[in-house]
């Protein structure tokens, strides 16, 4: 199983996010969210509380509530900060190539902020579409613009977005489980476990043991895109070579 570096730069791993977040300047929403992101990156979502956040920015907790109404708003803001780093070029004439780039960039962003991934997956579901922060909606808007400008209908563009990001969420959760939740499961340990399976009962798993033990998240993602993008083109492209409604 190929292990990949995840999380913030190892060179700053021992820094106290509380110390890093203190600032003598005027308190504002951006400062609060940046500090919250550092805490989540280091200690996970469970390590973030309004009290700890107030200590990190060096202000009384009451001051925080002037800028963020509650912890839920902070979590939304943290997800928004990370998603703001995902760039979608909605003017790219190569819509398939742009979607491939977006998918790869999203994966890398998730590996950089693994503790934020649960927020990226769950916070939008917990917030009605019309009440989500603008930054949380930006990737959706830009992907829709990319596909609609390429000639797809709005409904088809929305369907493509849902298929792509639905897979991305599942893919990155699976990859992070492999490299973070079970770091002790080395290639040798996994192979040993697979070879202990009864070959008469699990012949396919036994046969695929080498592939299962050499999981490569980047290669898995590219394989999915190689299947998805031509399929979309074949299904939605008419004889004239232009996108057509399903």
Regions of interest found by a model, annotated:
Residues 31-38, 42-43, 72-89, 101-105, ...:
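Alpha-helical structural segments
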Residues 59-68:
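Short hydrophobic/aromatic patch on the recognition helix
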Residues 87-129, 134-138, 161:
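Hydrophobic alpha-helical connector segments
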Residues 1-16, 149, 177-246:
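C-terminal peripheral helix-coil segments that are non-catalytic and often amphipathic
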Residues 126-151, 155-162, 173-174, 192-203:
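Amphipathic alpha-helical packing segments from all-alpha helical-bundle domains
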Residues 164-170:
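A short structural micro-motif
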Residues 1-56, 69-76:
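Basic, helix-initiating cap at the start of DNA-binding domains
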Residues 81-86, 113, 117, 171, ...:
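A short secondary-structure junction motif
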């Amino acid at each position: 199983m190929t292990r990949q570096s995840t999380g913030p730069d190892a060179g700053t791993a021992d820094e106290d996010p509380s110390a890093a977040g203190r600032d003598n300047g005027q308190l504002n929403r951006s400062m609060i969210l940046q500090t919250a992101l550092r805490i989540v990156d280091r200690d996970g979502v469970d390590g973030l509380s309004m009290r700890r956040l107030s200590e990190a920015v060096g202000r009384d907790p009451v001051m925080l509530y002037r800028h963020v109404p509650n912890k839920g708003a902070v979590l939304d803001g943290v997800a928004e900060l990370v998603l703001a780093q995902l760039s979608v070029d909605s003017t790219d004439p190569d819509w398939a190539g742009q979607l491939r780039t977006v998918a790869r960039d999203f994966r890398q962003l998730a590996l950089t902020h693994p503790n934020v991934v649960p927020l990226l997956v769950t916070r939008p579901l917990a917030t009605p579409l019309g009440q989500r922060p603008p930054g949380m909606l930006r990737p959706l808007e830009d992907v829709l613009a990319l596909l609609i400008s390429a000639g797809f209908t709005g409904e088809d563009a929305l369907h493509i977005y849902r298929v792509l990001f639905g897979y991305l969420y599942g893919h990155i959760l699976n990859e992070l489980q492999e490299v973070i939740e079970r770091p002790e499961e080395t290639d040798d340990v996994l192979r040993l476990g697979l070879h202990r399976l009864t070959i008469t009962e699990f012949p396919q798993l036994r046969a695929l043991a080498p592939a299962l033990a050499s999981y490569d998240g980047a290669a898995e993602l590219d394989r999915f895109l190689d299947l998805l993008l031509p399929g979309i083109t074949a299904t939605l492209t008419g004889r004239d070579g232009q996108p057509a409604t399903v």
